């Protein structure tokens, strides 16, 4: 925490002197600072940091959309998580919806670069929808994320395995809360992508009681 706080102070000073050069560094350091606060269980401080980061990235993305729209989308996703952590679920949903919409546009342009990010943001939206008592919509969001991620998981199992497991668990939680039937084909594909042995793969993502 001390290191990220020092980084924010450092980049804030430089951004005041040369905003064009260092505002992106300040925004990035604020996102990191927010993540640290979140990990330490200090959600109000995490929210303040991520909110400032989003405000900075909005300006940057308006000036140079190709360079900074991905940063804005990621920061909005973090902001949504921070809002949810303090009970501001409707605002959290709005932030994650904006992140999802931006990532959809980015993934349409550069699918290999941004489809995993889109899948991650869909998982975040699912968690927030569950918190709002809308589990059927949550299940649909998580399932979409899984379907988008699966082709990339097959190629990059080490890099994307943790994300895939998290999405799988989120999907199952939403399905259970909604009283829906599990899409066993989707879960089977996920298990095989994580582990070629179907049974081992199912256990790896918590999909089997055996």
Say what each PLM segment does:
Residues 140-142, 181-195:
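Alpha-helical repeat scaffolds
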Residues 191-210:
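Acidic/polar low-complexity scaffolding segments in large eukaryotic proteins
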Residues 1-176:
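A detector of tandem-repeat and repeat-rich interaction/domain scaffolds
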């Amino acid at each position: 925490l001390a290191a990220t706080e020092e980084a924010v102070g450092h980049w804030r000073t430089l951004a005041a002197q040369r905003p064009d050069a260092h505002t992106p560094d300040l925004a990035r350091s604020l996102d990191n600072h927010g993540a640290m606060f979140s990990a330490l269980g200090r959600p109000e401080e995490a929210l303040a940091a991520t909110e400032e980061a989003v405000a900075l990235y909005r300006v940057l993305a308006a000036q140079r959309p190709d360079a900074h729209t991905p940063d804005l989308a990621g920061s909005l996703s973090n902001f949504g998580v921070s809002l949810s952590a303090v009970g501001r679920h409707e605002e959290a949903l709005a932030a994650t919806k904006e992140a999802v919409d931006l990532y959809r546009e980015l993934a349409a342009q550069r699918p290999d670069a941004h489809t995993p990010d889109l899948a991650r943001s869909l998982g975040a939206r699912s968690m927030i929808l569950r918190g709002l008592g809308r589990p059927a919509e949550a299940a649909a969001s998580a399932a979409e994320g899984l379907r988008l991620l699966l082709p990339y998981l097959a190629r990059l199992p080490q890099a994307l395995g943790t994300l895939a497991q998290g999405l799988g668990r989120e999907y199952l939680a939403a399905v259970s809360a909604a009283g829906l039937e599990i899409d066993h084909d989707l879960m089977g594909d996920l298990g095989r992508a994580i582990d070629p042995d179907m049974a081992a793969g199912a256990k790896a993502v918590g999909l089997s009681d055996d």
